[in-house]
Every structure is written in structure tokens, then in C-alpha cells.
Regions:
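Short, small-residue-enriched loops and turns at beta-alpha junctions
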Residues: 30-32, 56-63, 84-91, 109-117, ...
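Hydrophobic side chains within alpha-helical segments
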Residues: 66-69, 112, 220
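Shared catalytic-loop signature of beta/alpha-barrel
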Residues: 39, 104-107, 115-225
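General beta-strand structural signal in soluble alpha/beta enzymes
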Residues: 25, 54, 80-82, 109-110, ...
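N-terminal capping/lid subdomain adjacent to the active-site entrance of alpha/beta enzymes
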Residues: 1-80, 85-103, 225
């Protein structure tokens, strides 16, 4: 924290002037037809989102088609992430993800059981350079410690409600900074989309001191329900 103190005022000015990059999952919900995915992806790009995320895991054939639709809509340079919501076994995840590599996914989120540290580590080794992200189901900093120190994940996804509040979040932010792991907080619910913005601002201003390789999640369509 003391190391970052000197640049905090400059970072505040930059944050006020330029904001913080964000991605959306609203473009890629399961059940959307191809035309809707393409339209929402283009809208997200035009609205200034830095990346989009698709849900995957129901059918490999469907995932190949949907990833192709999304990639064609956003172009080759915009990051495309995918989220399996814990649906795969470890070896199945590796095979499935290697089949989707042609679409250049930036990361795979929750590829398997959220408590399986060694499973995530094996997946990470088996699908590189695709990054592995998880953490929304982690209930405390100790489980995050296992994922981080075992080098089982590339991206730390804190869910501030599930982990039990700001003090526990701060512990994970500090741990992630120590091991140079970017934090992308989970925001898949009403209210969380607003909450995580503050967590990421804290991380940028006083903990990690950087926005490099970091974005916040915004899932706007959940506000409609």
C-alpha cells in the first residue's frame, strides 16, 4: 500500500477523466438465437465495452456456432471470454476448450467444480494460452489462497457478497497483487454490477495501482427482471 501511495492522486485524476474499462455478459446468454447474439455483440462494441462474454457448455456444436457468430460480430481484436458455470469434468474441459481455441477466447470462467484447485491447475496447463478464471463461488480468502499460490488460475474473480464483505475482499486484493494476479470481480446479479465498480476502483487506486489487464463486469439486462 505504501508503494502505491505516491501515485494515488494521479490515478484518481485519470480515473475521473477516462473511467474504468468494462465488459458485458448480456450479449451471450444461453438461449439467444444467432441473430440476437450478433446484434447484442455489435451493440456492446458500439457502446464502448472493452470485451464480451458468452455462456458455453450446453453443446460443443452450439458453442462452436455461437462463438463464430460472436467473433464475426466483434472482429478479431476485441477480447471474447467464455463462461461454463462449472459444467465440465477436468478432461472434458480441456478437450472442449481446445476445440474452441480457434475463436481466440481470452479466458474460460468456472470450467469445473469451484472447489477443485488441482482440477483448475490441470485445466490451466492443458488449455494455455487460454487463461483460466474463477472465484465467484469462493467463500473465503483461504480458498483463494489455494488457487493463487498453486498457480491454478490466471484471473481472480471475487464475489463480494459470497465472500462476506469488504474486509475479506481487501485480503484477496492484497494477495492477488502480491502474486501479480489481476482481479476481475464477479457481477452476475442485480446490485453486484454496481458494487464491484467500487472494489475495482479500490484495487486500482491503492492496491495494484494498474488497470492493465483488468475490467469490470456489467450485466445490464438483469436489471430488467
Amino acid at each position: 500500500l505504501r508503494e502505491q501511495e505516491a501515485g494515488t492522486a494521479d490515478r484518481i485524476r485519470l480515473l475521473e477523466a477516462r473511467g474504468y474499462p468494462a465488459y458485458t455478459t448480456s450479449a451471450g446468454w444461453l438461449g439467444y438465437d444467432d441473430a440476437k447474439i450478433a446484434r447484442l455483440c455489435r451493440e456492446a462494441r458500439d457502446q464502448g465495452f472493452s470485451a464480451i462474454k458468452l455462456k458455453v457448455g450446453r453443446s460443443l456444436e452450439d458453442d462452436v456456432r455461437r462463438c463464430r457468430v460472436a467473433r464475426e460480430a466483434i472482429g478479431p481484436d476485441m477480447p471474447l471470454m467464455i463462461d461454463a458455470n462449472q459444467v465440465w469434468e477436468v478432461d472434458q474441459a480441456i478437450d472442449w476448450l481446445n476445440a474452441l481455441k480457434r475463436f481466440d477466447p481470452f479466458f474460460i470462467e468456472e470450467p469445473t467444480s469451484p472447489d477443485d484447485v488441482e482440477g483448475h491447475r490441470k485445466i490451466r496447463q492443458g488449455v494455455a494460452p487460454v487463461r483460466v478464471a474463477t472465484g465467484e463461488m469462493c467463500q473465503n480468502r483461504i480458498l483463494f489462497k489455494q488457487f493463487i499460490t498453486r498457480d491454478a488460475i490466471d484471473i481472480v474473480q471475487i464475489d463480494a457478497c459470497r465472500i462476506g464483505g469488504l474486509n475479506e475482499v481487501l485480503a484477496v486484493l492484497l494477495m492477488a497483487a502480491k502474486y501479480d494476479k489481476p482481479v476481475w470481480p464477479h457481477a452476475g446479479g442485480v446490485g453486484l454490477c454496481e458494487y464491484v465498480q467500487h472494489l475495482s476502483m479500490i484495487d486500482y487506486l491503492v492496491v495494484s495501482g494498474t488497470k492493465r489487464g483488468r475490467v469490470i463486469e456489467y450485466v445490464d439486462h438483469l436489471h430488467e427482471h
